[in-house]
Design a protein with these regions (language model features):
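N-terminal secretory signal peptides
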Residues: 1-8, 19-26, 34-36
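Non-catalytic cap/lid and distal C-terminal segments of serine-dependent acyl enzymes
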Residues: 12-23, 38-209
Length: 209
């Protein structure tokens, strides 16, 4: 599902995608597999579009006040009898930046021949990959959606290496912050992290945003 968005630096994207290349060797033997059904992750699929390599899903979840979505890019010749490493690719913020921008900027071509699954989740326009203390637009707990619901759902739905050695996370701008935050806070979830133009600290001089 392509959509307009801010231009993405292709060199940075290649580096981000390349960050998981080593995992294909590390996790090739594969291993921890998810045995729970997909719905146990707390997500209900309300829409699915099969685009060949690109699979689009939209969910109902109590964590978000609307139906968030995700693009899942499968490798060429995806085979459910094999196990694949997964790259979680997090988008930046702003009105014209969302998870679909990666497809618009050519992520399919950039990953040709790479034996990995790329997961590009919705993160909101200014969600900062966090659970806000309060919200006047209903729940928007992006951190819970990504870390407690989406990752287990991905592992239950696709043939992944469902352990530390089989996951990497990369992001751009706001997504770069999210990649750093998730890796630091959820130790043992990701074997590789890369942040491109992502702030490491959101606090201003007075300790606020």
């Amino acid at each position: 599902r392509p959509a307009g968005g801010r231009a993405i630096n292709r060199r940075s994207m290649l580096k981000g995608v390349g960050g998981i290349a080593a995992l294909t060797a590390v996790g090739a033997g594969g291993s921890l597999t998810a045995s729970a059904p997909a719905q146990a992750a707390g997500l209900s699929v309300v829409e699915h579009q099969d685009g060949g390599r690109m699979q689009y899903y939209r969910f109902s979840t109590p964590s978000i006040g609307w139906n968030p979505a995700v693009n899942v890019l499968l490798p060429d010749g995806y085979n459910a009898s094999r196990r694949y490493p997964v790259l979680y690719l997090l988008h930046g913020g702003g009105l014209n930046a969302d998870f679909r921008a990666f497809d618009y900027e050519g992520i399919r071509d950039l990953t040709v021949g790479r034996e990995l699954i790329v997961v590009m989740p919705d993160g909101g326009k200014a969600g900062w990959y966090s659970n806000p203390v309060s919200s006047n637009v209903g729940p928007r707990n992006w951190e819970t959606f990504h870390m407690s619901e989406l990752i287990p759902w991905i592992d239950a739905t696709f043939s992944t290496i469902a352990e530390f050695s089989g996951r990497a996370v990369s992001g751009f701008s706001m997504g770069g912050f999210g990649a750093l935050k998730y890796t630091a806070k959820y130790y043992g979830h990701f074997a590789s992290v890369s942040s491109h133009s992502g702030p490491a600290d959101l606090r201003g001089p007075d300790g606020g945003m």
